[in-house]
């Protein structure tokens, strides 16, 4: 639904606050390009950066919603294939679980911008076959303790249907001794990072960027 153009103001603000270079990936969207097409594009982009002399340990991946899922898919893919992983991942209200049956997705299934019906539709259009649900790079909840993941910060919002699955993903990482930190903003909602004209949203974005900068 979004693109480099829609996210350019947000990414530019992040780069200014973090004082770092950010490379945006214009990845192909479903339903025209189903899983794992975007993951393959992301891996190509990562390998291109490495080929240009950027050390993988100096790379951090960041995304919001579906973009956060893609960032985590890359780190899962690297870990599952015993490749060196990136320095860190910063996941802003990530979509993690194709089952769409958490308590928060039921509680906030409508009336909060993102709906349960929309999420079911997104996953249906994203998956190529039902077997994708058993793939650890598609279904993030299938993370296993033999996967060594990078430092992780996960941003959640109180009125987001995806908040519980993101929190459960954070808990799984914590249980297996991965560095993970959850930043929860109880009064906010899915998509707030792109709505910084709202005072509460801007305050939250500035707060989580301060946290992000500390691990870079």
Predicted regions located by residue number:
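Alpha/beta-hydrolase superfamily serine-hydrolase fold, recognizing
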Residues: 1-216
């Amino acid at each position: 639904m979004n693109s480099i153009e829609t996210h350019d103001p947000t990414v530019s603000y992040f780069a200014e606050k973090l004082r770092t270079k950010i490379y945006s990936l214009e990845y192909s969207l479903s339903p025209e390009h189903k899983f794992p097409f975007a993951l393959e594009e992301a891996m190509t982009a990562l390998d291109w950066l490495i080929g240009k002399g950027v050390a993988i340990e100096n790379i951090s991946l960041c995304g919001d919603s579906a973009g956060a899922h893609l960032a985590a898919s890359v780190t899962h893919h690297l870990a599952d294939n015993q490749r060196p992983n990136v320095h860190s991942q910063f996941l802003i209200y990530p979509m993690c679980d194709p089952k769409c049956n958490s308590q928060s997705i039921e509680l906030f299934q409508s009336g909060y911008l993102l709906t349960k019906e929309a999420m079911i539709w997104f996953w249906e259009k994203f998956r190529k076959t039902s077997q994708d649900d058993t793939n650890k790079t598609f279904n993030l909840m299938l993370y296993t303790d033999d996967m060594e993941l990078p430092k992780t910060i996960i941003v959640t919002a109180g009125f987001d249907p995806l908040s519980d699955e993101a929190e459960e993903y954070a808990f799984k990482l914590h249980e297996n001794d991965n560095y993970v930190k959850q930043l929860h903003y109880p009064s906010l909602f899915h998509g707030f990072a792109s709505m910084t004209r709202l005072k509460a949203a801007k305050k939250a974005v500035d707060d989580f960027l301060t946290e992000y900068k500390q691990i870079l």
